A protein has these predicted regions:
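N-terminal donor/sugar-recognition subdomains of glycan-related enzymes
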Residues: 1-157
Length: 157
């Protein structure tokens, strides 16, 4: 729980209203966390693993091998899981801001409990459990280059 408190403080500095929402979110047990072969936490919801149970960072790198941004584009990621693919984008495109859309608050809370968010900040803006019309009206969407995290997408079907 200490990591969760540290992450809340970090989130407060960049997105205070989201930090308050996360803090109020009750802990739910439908996100199960196991450890991958290489020692990283991986979330599972029902029968869906959100990352490789062996090498989630390698899976992220391989999955993004053909993802390319033009100089005027903003990377927009649909589905957070535990963010291995987001870190890959941040590493591949240093200095760029990444917009992450995660429709399920409980997944984000579990992410906050299990993953140090410091490497994501300040270049990541999290949009959590927000209706699509609000996302579109609140953000400049013209130059979005979307990446869909496929396991997260399967959850929303």
């Amino acid at each position: 729980m200490e990591l969760f408190k540290k992450n809340l403080e970090l989130l407060r500095s960049s997105q205070p209203s989201l930090a308050r929402r996360v803090e109020r979110e009750p802990k739910k047990n439908f996100v199960h966390v196991s450890i991958s072969k290489d020692g990283n936490p991986i979330p599972k919801i029902g029968s869906v693993l959100l990352h490789s149970k062996y090498y989630p960072s390698k899976e992220a790198k391989d999955g993004l091998s053909e993802y390319c941004l033009r100089s005027n584009e903003t990377p927009v990621v649909y589905g957070l899981g535990f963010g291995y693919h987001v870190l890959e984008i941040l590493n591949k495109y240093k200095g760029l801001k990444v917009l992450v859309i995660e429709p399920v608050m409980s997944i984000f809370r579990s992410f906050m409990e299990n993953v140090d968010i410091e490497p994501f900040l300040p270049n990541t803006q999290f949009i959590i459990s927000t209706p699509p019309p609000k996302i579109i009206t609140s953000n400049q969407t013209v130059n979005w280059n979307k990446y869909e995290h496929q396991p997260s997408k399967r959850l929303s079907c």
